[in-house]
Amino acid sequence: MFVVSFALSILYYFAAKSNDRTQQFLRGNVSILPKRKGRFGPRERAPAAPLRAMPAERLFFRRGSAIMNVRRGVPRARCRRTPCGGETDPRAARVPKNMDINKYDPKFKLRRRDLLGLTDLTSEEIFELLYAAKAMKKKFRMRENSTLLRGKTVALLFGNASTRTRVSFEMGIRQMSGDYIYLSKDETQLSRGESLKDTAAMLGRYGLSAVVLRSLTETQTHEFASYSDIPVINGITEVSHPLQILSDLFTIWEVKGRLDNLKLAYIGDGNNIANSLIMGCSKVNMDVAIASPHGYSPARSVVERAMQYGDVLITDDIAAAVHDADVVYTDVFISMNEEDDEEKKHILSRYRVTPEVMALAKPDAVFMHCMPVHRGEEVAAEVVDGPQSICYDQAENRLHVNKAALALLVK
């Protein structure tokens, strides 16, 4: 008994002395709990008995289980995944047996009215949107306008600065023979405290056919949709950016010729882009690896849900994430309204994508950035302006994906 107690004391001592990569595993779930706004944080324990503690290189989620890959040949610790709650739409948990988009037979239909997030979409619905975007791009290249929105008017309710989202929607609606009205949140009664319920219910009474929101939080966007009689499209929230990631998947499909059995590595802040990439990539059978500093990793709830569909790697090690990647992706370090966060800038500064980082990926890997780009901060100019960059293709495809969403949602 004394020997056992002494051994446990030694184990506890070295676990406590280990570096920031020390992670705790708990029976039935991972003990890494949110440090900032529901994100994974280091050395934070859930109220349960620990299985073991060890220096870890990365945290790897593989379809329903969590695996800690450790250094120096230490065996991996496995835990069963704990149920993390239901999907907004139960059908979203269904993954088609054939995950090859090139073998999918599109119907060009969606069974839903709104597009609020990738968590809600089934894999088939993602494929439907991507095939519709492909058709829209073909018409665009042939300079053929569509009449799908003739007699329709779409409201763009925006609350912050926008270039790609606003221009792509305005031009897309025009190219589909529709009309739009641009509403700045500050110029509506929402800025003076009018309820979301009243605003959402009222807009449908004026003959609008859909509303694109880029002004509300994730919770407010879902609340708005619950009161609206017309389709609601999430342009962006602090938690998700579904249209951007649909555009990214479409771009990868174009460049790589497939989506399944690829690996995407995201480097930087675990923000709304990272959250949506995890969900979107997992649902099309694409592995995704996220390299973020502790306290800035993606939302835990998103990672747990994505475990139902595919493999997710969460790490603070850039090399581990980028190794053998087909796509390397990053986003701005500082989001809107965070410009004065000097601590965040300092912490993320070593997560810059450089030519040396790109060299760790596959030779034919491509670089992606959702823009705007801050050269010298999150990415070196040689990378974003180099031959591996497909950022402008990515940006153009926002137009075609937005048109696809409108075509399938607006009746």
Which role does the model predict for each range below?
Residues S9, N29-S31, F40-P50, M54-P55, ...:
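Intrinsic, low-complexity polybasic segments
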Residues D364-A365, M371-K411:
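Adenosine-phosphate binding glycine-rich loop
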Residues G159-M171, K256-T330:
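Glycine-rich phosphate/diphosphate-binding loop of Rossmann-like nucleotide-binding domains
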Residues R141-R143, T147-W253, R375:
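Phosphate/diphosphate ligand-binding glycine-rich loop within oxidoreductases
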Residues M307-E382:
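Rossmann-like adenosine-cofactor binding region
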Residues M1-L26:
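A hydrophobic, multi-pass inner-membrane permease signature
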Residues M99-V167, M171:
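Positively charged, low-complexity intrinsically disordered leader regions
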